[in-house]
């Protein structure tokens, strides 16, 4: 119990006490309690004495009525008045005694109350712990009992149901030993066969041993030290026997023993076969181990018997008896060892079938706390009763809380008046603040509704034309395009999707402010995302002549699990800033594991210009992560990530203008820019880096930067993902479609800058091309001259080509051996040109304009080498055949006020065989969907003029409900309604609005699903498959 509860309780008691005091004092005043000053007025006349007495009484009554009526505060004049009153000393002492006695009683009651609460909590704790142990023991026993019963079916099937039997002692022993983990509570399993007296001689001859009596003549169990199977007597003559023929190794000593020769076992066996259920014995010392245990027995029948079979029928159908031996002491001890609190309480298990004489099955009589909890145990045998009794080992602790609380109440009583005054004042102030907050809350809710509606409207209006562009590009991908055209379309699609994601930043800002921004957990291709981001900035980098490059370490898995959209958003923001402020040099994006920080290219500080991508100096990269909390002060890792996690570190390095020192402290502040001229010169809102920092934090990472004015900036962030590679999936460095014609080819890269050469090596090896890097042209020619391997192409950087092209081409013209490889020029700008006169006598080089991307490289090499084989576009999602089977012949109505969206949606559905009808408004949709009609589904836009999709859907549902009532009342014929007894057309919302509130409104107005624009095959399949199961549904 917290201090606040104690104070609150004290305030309530103090208030009650103050009211009692007021009542006592009022009673004293009413009874004419006078001070000694009344004795001094003897000379005054009776009339004057009467007037003075009456006046005093009126003053006293006014004072105490004011106090008792308010009961909340004591004004300063009340203290003065109280001090002026001369009470009789005897009555004052009585009042003090009443005060003391009252609070002593309150303290005693408080002590008793808290002590009883502690005792109740102790009882509840004991009950919970005891019930938990009883439940675990009961559950584990039931599991073992079910497996024993299953073995009885196994015996019936493979021993008695097979001729010859498929089970012998060796097979049974091996099987039970290997499956013992399924019966953790049993110490052994044995099977006894039913043998009639007439069959005994033949049975003993077949088995090779004599049926022996289980116990001695005194019916006492044999001690483990005296146990000798040969010394046991043969079983006496009786009508039938139950000798054990199969036994687990742990109880193999019971083979040949007659289970009917023991009193307890005989009753157990007879009851099991007559009832058809599992039967338990009373606890008894087990043979040989002499430990306390029970035997669970199931009868094995010749055939399956109905549940209502009579005992006589069951006896006649009995083949034998399967028993499981449970060592009670061991199984309870093993159970308690699994619990961390096993030393806290004492556990006793009893067989209480005979309530007057319970049998202790487990436990000791160690003295403990007198508190006891009894939990029933149900072991499947209704005739035997068991229970678990639990007690605490330690005595209850001293009630410190009760003593401290009761003492505190006495102290609090002296401050009751002040506490009441402060409390009432606080309550009054809180009530006023609460009223103000209610008013502000109403205003905020109204503003939030308006804001949500505004975001929904603006989001829809902006997304509608953009989705039309993306939809048309998707339809264009289904036409006959060559590889280059496909690359152009993919680039346009990537740019469009990136634009939509940038629009989403406006919506994300609202989520960030409310703290509701969440990340997805999906499988994605990291290298593919980097290629898409490069496509966004390739045009601008080529126009500026800035080299844009990406390098991803081969130690980074091909597939990761995380939020690809947010990761792309971070990269887009950082690279967008770099391309905005960089006029020359390079922008270099690297992705490594954190483990590689101090290795080779990612561990260097890039202090030497020759080690950079473009040869220009850059900001110290290591300074961008030196303040990360994940690393210690000396730069080494201070943590070890868990094995399934992939901890990436991504750096975006540029040679731009840099960030002024005075502006670096506010770089991540929302809506803050370096200076007022930045927004005029370069544009932007100033929220990109702020959103990026928030997203990095959600990815369990950190972000930092290092910047030097007039040199450049390097932004570095970390992010934690999960490994998306399947266990059986082989590593494939090329995540683009595999072009088999490049496999086995070899290329020589001529570049004297190691960082830039490694980027070229990275991209070409993704296509399966083996790459050799040399710094000069002479070394490339020497490599060709050696001729150890065939070189298919020579890649030359434009910087080297401009400097050494004359000598290089002359040497190629002199030696025909040098003409076989294809020349490829790697340029940074689209304006790069090659003199035709210079290349006389040789094939002009293929020009590849950076940034390098796998799809662009593949398309250019296919065209330049003449080996291109156009592959059909790869569609993700479910196979087209599945969607075609679902939509073939379906009549579908599409409702949208935008003609472009109508064309896109109609084209997407017609591609899968649907019969599409278009409507431009909700009013027309209502007229087309008035029952009876022949439509199978409707795709409804939400925001439309005249009547939106919500209202149109409500009216459609009203028409269907009215028609269903008419059919039910017989006012409309089923034949006239297409043999339909109930009308409910699947209506799917079709909109670009992705706000959650809009989704909820769709379902509320009667829509059945939600499809975002433009259609994605996977989402379309997921929605329509809920309503269309097979083409036969159309016919029906």
From Swiss-Prot:
Subcellular location: Cell membrane; Endoplasmic reticulum membrane
Induction: Rapidly induced by dehydration, high salinity and cold stresses.
This protein's UniProt keywords: Cell membrane, Cytokinin signaling pathway, Developmental protein, Endoplasmic reticulum, Kinase, Membrane, Phosphoprotein, Repeat, Transferase, Transmembrane, Transmembrane helix
GO molecular function list: cytokinin receptor activity; phosphorelay sensor kinase activity; protein histidine kinase activity; protein histidine kinase binding
Domain of life: Eukaryota
Expression sites (tissue/organ): Mostly expressed in leaves and flowers, and, to a lower extent, in roots, stems, and siliques, especially in the vascular tissues. Present in seedlings.
Transmembrane segments: 9-29, 95-115, 400-420
Residues with PTM 4-aspartylphosphate: 941
Modified residues (Phosphohistidine): 460
Annotated EC: 2.7.13.3
Every Histidine kinase domain range: 457-723
GO cellular component: endoplasmic reticulum membrane; nucleus; plasma membrane
UniProt PTM comment: Autophosphorylated predominantly on His residues. Activation probably requires a transfer of a phosphate group between a His in the transmitter domain and an Asp of the receiver domain.
Phenotypic consequence of gene deletion: Hypersensitivity to ABA, and strong drought and salinity tolerance. Reduced sensitivity to cytokinin (mostly in roots). More rapid germination, reduced requirement for light, and decreased far-red light sensitivity. Early senescence promoted by darkness. Reduced sensitivity to N-isobutyl decanamide. Defects in procambium proliferation and absence of secondary growth. Enhanced freezing tolerance. Impaired benzyladenine (6-BA)-mediated repression of the iron uptake pathway. Disturbed cytokinin-mediated flower development abnormality. Impaired meristematic development in seedlings.
Subunit structure: Interacts with AHK2, AHK4, AHP1, AHP2, AHP3, AHP5 and At5g43560.
Role played: Cytokinins (CK) receptor related to bacterial two-component regulators. Functions as a histidine kinase and transmits the stress signal to a downstream MAPK cascade. This protein undergoes an ATP-dependent autophosphorylation at a conserved histidine residue in the kinase core, and a phosphoryl group is then transferred to a conserved aspartate residue in the receiver domain. In the presence of cytokinin, feeds phosphate to phosphorelay-integrating histidine phosphotransfer protein (HPt) and activates subsequent cascade. Involved in meristems establishment in seedlings.
Designated name of the protein: Histidine kinase 3
């Amino acid at each position: 119990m917290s201090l606040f509860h104690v104070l609150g309780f004290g305030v309530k008691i103090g208030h009650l006490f103050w009211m009692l005091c007021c009542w006592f004092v009022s009673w004293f005043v009413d009874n004419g309690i006078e001070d000694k000053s009344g004795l001094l007025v003897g000379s005054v006349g009776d009339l004057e004495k009467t007037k003075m007495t009456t006046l005093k009484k009126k003053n006293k009554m006014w004072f105490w009525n004011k106090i008792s009526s308010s009961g909340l505060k004591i004004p300063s004049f009340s203290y003065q008045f109280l001090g002026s009153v001369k009470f009789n000393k005897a009555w004052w002492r009585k009042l003090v005694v009443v005060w003391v006695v009252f609070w002593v009683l309150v303290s005693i009651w408080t002590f008793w109350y808290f002590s009883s609460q502690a005792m109740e909590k102790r009882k509840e704790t004991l009950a919970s712990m005891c019930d938990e142990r009883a439940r675990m023991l009961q559950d584990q026993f039931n599991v073992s009992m079910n497996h024993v019963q299953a073995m009885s079916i196994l015996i019936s099937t493979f021993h008695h149901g097979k001729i010859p039997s498929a089970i012998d002692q060796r097979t049974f022993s091996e099987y039970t030993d290997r499956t013992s983990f399924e019966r953790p509570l049993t110490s052994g399993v044995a099977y006894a066969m039913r043998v009639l007296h007439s069959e005994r001689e033949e049975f003993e001859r077949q088995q090779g041993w004599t049926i022996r009596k289980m116990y001695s003549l005194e019916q006492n169990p044999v001690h483990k030290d005296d146990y000798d199977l040969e010394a046991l007597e043969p079983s006496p003559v009786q009508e039938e026997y139950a000798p054990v023929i199969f036994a687990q190794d742990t109880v193999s000593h019971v083979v040949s023993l007659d289970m009917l020769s023991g009193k307890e076992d005989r009753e157990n066996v007879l009851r099991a076969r007559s009832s058809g259920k599992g039967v338990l014995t009373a606890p008894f010392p087990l043979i040989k181990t002499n430990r306390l245990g029970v035997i669970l027995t199931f009868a094995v029948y010749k055939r399956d018997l109905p549940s209502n079979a009579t005992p006589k029928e069951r006896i006649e159908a009995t083949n034998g008896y399967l028993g499981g031996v449970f060592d009670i002491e061991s199984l309870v001890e093993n159970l308690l060892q699994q619990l961390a609190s096993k030393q806290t309480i004492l556990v006793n298990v009893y067989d209480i079938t005979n309530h007057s004489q319970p049998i202790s099955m487990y436990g000791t009589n160690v003295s403990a706390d007198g508190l006891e909890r009894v939990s029933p145990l149900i072991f499947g045998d209704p005739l035997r009763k068991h229970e678990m009794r639990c007690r605490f080992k330690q005595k209850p602790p001293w009630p410190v809380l009760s003593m401290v609380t009761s003492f505190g109440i006495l102290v609090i009583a002296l401050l009751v008046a002040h506490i009441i005054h402060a409390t009432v004042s606080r309550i009054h102030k809180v009530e006023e603040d609460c009223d103000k907050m209610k008013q502000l809350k109403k205003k905020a809710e109204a503003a939030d509704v308006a804001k949500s509606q505004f975001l929904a409207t603006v989001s829809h209006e902006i997304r509608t034309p953009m989705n039309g562009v993306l939809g048309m590009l998707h339809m264009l991908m289904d036409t006959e395009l060559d590889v280059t055209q496909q690359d152009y379309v993919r680039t346009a699609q990537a740019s469009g999707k990136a634009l939509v994601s940038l629009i989403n930043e406006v919506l994300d800002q609202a989520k960030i402010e409310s703290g509701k921004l969440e990340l997805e957990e999906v499988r994605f291709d990291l290298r593919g995302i980097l290629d898409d981001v490069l496509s966004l900035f390739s045009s601008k980098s080529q126009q500026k002549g800035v080299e844009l490059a990406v390098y991803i370490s081969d130690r980074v898995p091909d597939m990761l699990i995380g939020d690809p959209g947010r990761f792309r958003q971070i990269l887009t923001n950082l690279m967008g800033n770099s391309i905005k402020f960089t006029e020359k040099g390079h922008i270099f994006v690297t992705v490594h594991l954190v483990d590689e920080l101090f290795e080779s290219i990612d561990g260097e500080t890039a202090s030497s210009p020759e080690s950079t991508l473009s040869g220009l100096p850059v900001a110290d990269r290591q300074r961008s992560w030196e303040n990360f909390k994940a690393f210690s002060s000396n730069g080494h890792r201070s943590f070890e990530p868990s094995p399934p996690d992939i901890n990436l570190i991504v750096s975006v390095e540029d040679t731009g203008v840099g960030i002024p020192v005075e502006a670096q402290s506010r770089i991540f502040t929302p809506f803050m820019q370096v200076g007022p001229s930045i927004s005029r010169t370069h544009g932007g809102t100033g929220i990109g880096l702020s959103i990026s920092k928030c997203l990095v934090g959600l990815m369990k990472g950190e972000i930092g930067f290092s910047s030097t004015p007039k040199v450049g900036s390097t932004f570095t962030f970390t992010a934690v993902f999960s490994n998306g590679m399947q266990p059986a999936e082989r590593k494939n460095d090329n995540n683009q479609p595999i072009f088999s014609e490049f496999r086995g080819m070899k290329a020589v890269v001529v570049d004297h800058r190691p960082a830039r050469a490694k980027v070229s090596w990275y991209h070409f090896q993704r296509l399966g091309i083996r790459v050799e890097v040399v710094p000069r042209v002479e070394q490339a020619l020497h490599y060709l001259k050696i001729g150890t391997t065939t070189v298919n192409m020579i890649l030359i950087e434009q910087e080297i080509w401009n400097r050494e092209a004359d000598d290089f081409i002359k040497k190629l013209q002199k030696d025909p051996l040098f003409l076989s490889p294809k020349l490829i020029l790697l340029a940074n700008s689209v304006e790069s040109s090659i003199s035709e006169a210079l290349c006389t006598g040789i094939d002009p080089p293929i020009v590849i304009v950076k940034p390098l991307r796998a799809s662009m490289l593949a398309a250019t090499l296919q065209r330049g080498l003449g080996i291109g084989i156009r592959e059909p576009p790869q569609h993700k999602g479910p196979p087209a055949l599945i969607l075609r089977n679902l939509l073939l012949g379906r009549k579908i109505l599409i409702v949208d006020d935008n003609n472009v969206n109508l064309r896109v949606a109609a084209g997407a559905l017609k591609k899968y065989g649907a019969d599409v009808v278009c409507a431009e408004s909700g009013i027309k949709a209502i007229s087309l969907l008035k029952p009876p009609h022949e439509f199978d589904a409707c795709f409804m836009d939400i925001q439309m003029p005249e009547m939106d999709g919500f209202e149109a859907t409500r009216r459609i549902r009203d028409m269907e409900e009215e028609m269903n009532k008419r059919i039910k009342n017989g006012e409309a014929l089923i034949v006239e309604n297409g043999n339909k007894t109930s009308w409910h057309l699947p209506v799917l919302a079709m909109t670009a609005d992705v706000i959650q509130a809009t989704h909820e409104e769709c379902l509320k107005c009667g829509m059945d699903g939600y499809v975002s624009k433009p259609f994605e095959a996977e989402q379309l399949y997921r929605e329509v498959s809920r309503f269309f199961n097979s083409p036969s549904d159309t016919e029906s």
